[in-house]
Amino acid sequence: MAAGSITTLPTESEDGGNTPFSPGSFKDPKRLYCKNGGFFLRINSDGRVDGSRDKSDSHIKLQLQAVERGVVSIKGITANRYLAMKEDGRLTSLRCITDECFFFERLEANNYNTYRSRKYSSWYVALKRTGQYKNGSSTGPGQKAILFLPMSAKS
């Protein structure tokens, strides 16, 4: 490469397949690993939300969708339900998306993400050490229960 030249990356490989830089790859399914207890956030088909340590549990595969800058919805792929925080702080899941299904996603200094309710703005998505969800009214900055590491859920 000569000094001052510009190189562009192709969007397709020569054989027509996708490259690692293909558009839409950010939409790959994720697992949200909680620092508190080592559980993955699970959205069950019956609407319950809890944690599971079983990496093969299909209910931990989640679709995070940006709805605006810094705001995401979290959908359980197998359950086909959206994570929601109710007015009493309970975590549940809903078949149809509502204003209770949007969360501020923030990358913290320790490289974990937090998910804070947009509607109930001082409450966070959190899991207890037992794998049960933690009520939003009992959450706050600095707690291990609110820290999640997004991991690939492909395959």
From Swiss-Prot:
One of its GO terms (molecular function) is heparin binding. Residues 1-24 are annotated as: Disordered. The keyword Calcium does not apply. It is found in: Secreted; Nucleus. The record marks K128, R129, K134 as: Important for interaction with integrin. The keyword Transmembrane helix does not apply. Its main location: secreted. One of its GO terms (biological process) is positive regulation of cell division. Heparin binds at K27, D28, P29, K30, R31, R116, S117, R118, K119. One of its GO terms (cellular component) is nucleus. Residues 1-9 form a propeptide. It comes from the Eukaryota. Gene3D superfamilies: 2.80.10.50. Pfam families: FGF. InterPro entries: Fibroblast_GF_fam (IPR002209), IL1/FGF (IPR008996). Coiled coil: none annotated. SUPFAM superfamilies: Cytokine. Keywords: Angiogenesis, Developmental protein, Differentiation, Growth factor, Heparin-binding, Mitogen, Nucleus, Secreted. Transmembrane segments: none annotated. Residues 1-11 have a biased composition (Polar residues). Acts as a ligand for FGFR1, FGFR2, FGFR3 and FGFR4. Also acts as an integrin ligand which is required for FGF2 signaling. Plays an important role in the regulation of cell survival, cell division, cell differentiation and cell migration. Functions as a potent mitogen in vitro. Can induce angiogenesis. Belongs to the heparin-binding growth factors family. This is Fibroblast growth factor 2.
